[in-house]
């Protein structure tokens, strides 16, 4: 028998989400009692096992803030300049700090126009007025409404209450409430400005109790880089990013691996590498903290059709997870998630968390443009391998950067729209609720037990049809089962 026939006879069978279900198990576990927190790197523990994709129609700073507040993690895409991406990371970090250390300030002799420019640029409503490192006033948007052309010192509030570096959250909140102020400068022993506490940050800390934060009280954030963009990784690391996500269509590329090893040594942030779909890749990526699994499962990806390469996602997750376990690496399943039940299946197959694109692209916080089609609201969504994304700068992800002219790009993705789905909070509520329900059915109290107790059954096409609503005309659309996909 020829070797080519042997290839076919020895080929493994690959399964994806629609090919499997989990078998119900005896349980005492109630969905409301399960713990959905998960570790995705040695230093990053999430309160929900969900990351937003590093795509230019999915994750910029607003999505990253929303994800972190709900207990997940946003990965800011790299289809922008280094300076822009660094600023995006900083905006996430500034969103909820207890004490903001890199305070944006202004001198008393500056114009009101410049004060407005700074506020709009950095997304803030007020500025400490500083002279020789000492606070001499506070200027806010309320102070300068319709008063262009004047100087800061003419309109600033001069009587400024300050606090020492030793102040705690409750004390700061009490001072601000008693004095009816929303900004509290922090000064050192010499009276020099070293930080700023804002009422909005304190309120957010109490409102978003499930948020993931570092020891400074800052929201966690990740950012994507090319394996060959060392400067970008270093600048993001300096900006305080918590996780560097090396973002390439095929991470098991030997040139990329050499570059990633060098990058790993020069950044202190935790390090995730993707994407892969072959357990052999794990052997060469042991320098990473986690690997990201998925070659072509995304709704906007055409890699499997254009290149003929990929592994159905459930099988890819399982194969990679088995190998990753040997090295103590974490696994993130990236792509192909259509319903909350798919998240349950991905984790049961070995993933520690999932990355979502399509399901989050239609949210208010996603950067895609809103469009109206036949009276219904949609948001633009495109693959990073689509022609539009490649023209903007994403070609390198598919090893088509530099030498290829725009008209010669070979896209591995498409562009389109998805239905508007409301806020990130609303979408995640349904997804996490479905995950908790699935854990209850299999008797899993936490993510670890879901991996251990989840048993699969392979289903037929008839089984899949039976799994969905059938023999009915649906008149009221459920929030977790959209009629239009």
Curated annotation (Swiss-Prot):
Annotated metabolic or biological route of this protein: Purine metabolism; XMP biosynthesis via de novo pathway; XMP from IMP: step 1/1
Catalytic activity from the UniProt record: IMP + NAD(+) + H2O = XMP + NADH + H(+)
Positions with a binding annotation for IMP: 299, 334-336, 357-358, 381-385, 412
Entry keywords, A to Z: CBS domain, GMP biosynthesis, Metal-binding, NAD, Oxidoreductase, Potassium, Purine biosynthesis, Repeat
GO biological process: GMP biosynthetic process; GTP biosynthetic process
EC code: 1.1.1.205
This protein's record includes keyword Calcium: no
Cofactor: K(+)
Activity control, per UniProt: Mycophenolic acid (MPA) is a non-competitive inhibitor that prevents formation of the closed enzyme conformation by binding to the same site as the amobile flap. In contrast, mizoribine monophosphate (MZP) is a competitive inhibitor that induces the closed conformation. MPA is a potent inhibitor of mammalian IMPDHs but a poor inhibitor of the bacterial enzymes. MZP is a more potent inhibitor of bacterial IMPDH.
UniProt GO MF annotations: IMP dehydrogenase activity; metal ion binding; nucleotide binding
Catalytic residues as annotated in Swiss-Prot or TrEMBL: 301, 397
Highest taxon listed in the record's lineage: Archaea
CBS domain sequence ranges: 99-154, 156-212
Enzyme type, top EC level: oxidoreductase
Function in brief: Catalyzes the conversion of inosine 5'-phosphate (IMP) to xanthosine 5'-phosphate (XMP), the first committed and rate-limiting step in the de novo synthesis of guanine nucleotides, and therefore plays an important role in the regulation of cell growth.
Subunit structure: Homotetramer.
Protein family membership: Belongs to the IMPDH/GMPR family.
Protein's name in the database: Inosine-5'-monophosphate dehydrogenase
Natural source organism: Pyrococcus furiosus (strain ATCC 43587 / DSM 3638 / JCM 8422 / Vc1)
Phylogenetic placement of the source organism: Archaea, Methanobacteriati, Methanobacteriota, Thermococci, Thermococcales
């Amino acid at each position: 028998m020829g070797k080519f026939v042997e290839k076919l006879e020895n080929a493994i069978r690959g399964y994806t989400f629609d090919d499997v279900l989990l078998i119900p198990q005896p349980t005492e576990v109630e969905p409301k009692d399960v713990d959905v927190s998960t570790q995705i790197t040695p230093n990053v523990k999430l309160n929900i096992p969900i990351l937003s994709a590093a795509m230019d129609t999915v994750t910029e700073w607003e999505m990253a803030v929303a994800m972190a507040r709900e207990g997940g993690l946003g990965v800011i895409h790299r289809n922008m300049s280094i300076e822009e991406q660094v600023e995006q990371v900083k905006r996430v970090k500034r969103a909820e700090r207890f004490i903001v250390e890199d305070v944006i300030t202004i001198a008393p002799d500056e114009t009101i126009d410049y004060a407005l420019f700074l506020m709009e640029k950095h997304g803030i409503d007020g500025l400490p007025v500083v002279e020789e490192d000492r606070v001499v006033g506070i200027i806010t948007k309320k102070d300068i409404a319709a008063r262009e052309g004047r100087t800061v010192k003419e309109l600033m509030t001069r009587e400024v209450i300050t606090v020492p570096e030793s102040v705690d959250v409750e004390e700061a909140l009490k001072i601000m409430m008693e004095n009816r102020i929303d900004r509290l400068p922090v000064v050192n022993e010499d009276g020099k400005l070293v930080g700023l506490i804002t009422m909005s940050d304190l309120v957010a800390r109490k409102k978003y109790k499930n948020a993931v934060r570092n020891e400074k009280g800052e929201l966690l954030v990740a950012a994507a880089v090319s394996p060959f963009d060392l400067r970008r990784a270093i600048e993001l690391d300096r900006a305080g990013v918590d996780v560097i996500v090396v973002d390439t269509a095929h991470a098991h590329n030997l040139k990329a691996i050499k570059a990633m090893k060098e990058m790993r040594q020069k950044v202190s942030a935790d390090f995730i590498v993707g994407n892969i779909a072959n357990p052999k890749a794990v052997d060469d990526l042991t320098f990473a903290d986690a690997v990201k699994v998925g070659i072509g499962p995304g709704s906007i990806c055409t890699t499997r059709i254009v290149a003929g390469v990929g592994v159905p996602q459930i099988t890819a997750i399982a194969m990679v997870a088995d190998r990753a376990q040997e090295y103590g690496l974490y696994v993130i399943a990236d792509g192909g998630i259509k319903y909350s039940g798919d998240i349950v299946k991905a984790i049961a197959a070995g993933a520690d968390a999932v990355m979502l694109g399509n399901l989050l692209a239609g949210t208010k916080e996603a950067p895609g443009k809103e469009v109206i089609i036949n009276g219904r609201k949609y948001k633009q969504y495109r693959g990073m391998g689509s022609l539009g994304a490649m023209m903007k700068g994403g070609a390198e992800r598919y090893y088509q950067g530099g030498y290829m002219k725009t008209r010669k790009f070979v896209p591995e993705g498409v562009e389109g729209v998805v239905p508007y789905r409301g806020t990130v909070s609303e979408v995640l509520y349904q997804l996490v609720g479905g995950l908790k329900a699935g854990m209850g059915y299999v008797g899993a109290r936490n993510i670890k037990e879901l991996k251990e107790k989840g048993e699969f059954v392979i289903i037929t096409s008839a089984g899949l049809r039976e799994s969905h609503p059938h023999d009915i005309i649906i008149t009221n659309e459920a929030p977790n089962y959209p009629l239009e996909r």
